[in-house]
Amino acid sequence: MKKLLLVFATCFLFSCATDNKKKDIEKSDPMSGIMVGKDSKSDAMLQFTKAYQENNMSSAKSIFTEDVVFNVNDTKMSFDQVNAGFSSGHDFFDNIKHTEFNVSTMYYNDGKIFTNYWYTWTATSKKTNNEITL
C-alpha cells in the first residue's frame, strides 16, 4: 500500500511539473496565444463579408482606418483596391452567398492579431445561369 501511494504521489508531481513547463513554453512562444470568435474584429469581418454579399462594399469602409492595408494572398491592398476587386465579382455572378462560415481572431503572444474567415462561396453565373459552389 505504501508503494502504491508513493507511485501515485510521484506521478502526481511529474504531471504538475509537466503542466507548468507547458504553460511557460506557451507564454514564451510567439506563435501561441488565444483564439476568439466573439470579439470586435470578428464582428467587423462579418460586417465586411455581409457588405460584399450585398454588393455594398462602400458601406464597410467605416470599419477601417484610412490607411488600412489588406493582405490578400501575399498582396498588400488598400480599401479602394479591395472594394473594386470584390465588387467586380458581382459583374459576373448573381446571388453571391457565404454559407457554413466560421470567423475567429487570433491574438498572438508577440502582439500580432489576425482575423480569419472560412466559408463556402456560392453564386449563380450570369453567363450560364448555373450555380457554382466553392
PLM regions with names:
Residues 12-15:
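C-terminal motif of bacterial Sec signal peptides marking the signal peptidase cleavage site
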Residues 1-4:
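Positively charged n-region of N-terminal signal peptides that target proteins for export
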Residues 6-8:
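Sec-dependent N-terminal signal peptides
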Residues 50-53, 57, 65-69, 87-95:
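Sec-exported extracytoplasmic/periplasmic mature domains
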Residues 17-57, 62:
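Short, low-complexity N-terminal intrinsically disordered segments enriched in polar/charged residues
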Residues 48, 59-61, 68, 82, ...:
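Hydrophobic pocket/interface hotspot
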Residues 87-133:
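Surface-exposed, charged secondary-structure patches
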Residues 31, 35, 63, 67-78:
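A short gly/proline-enriched turn/hairpin at secondary-structure junctions
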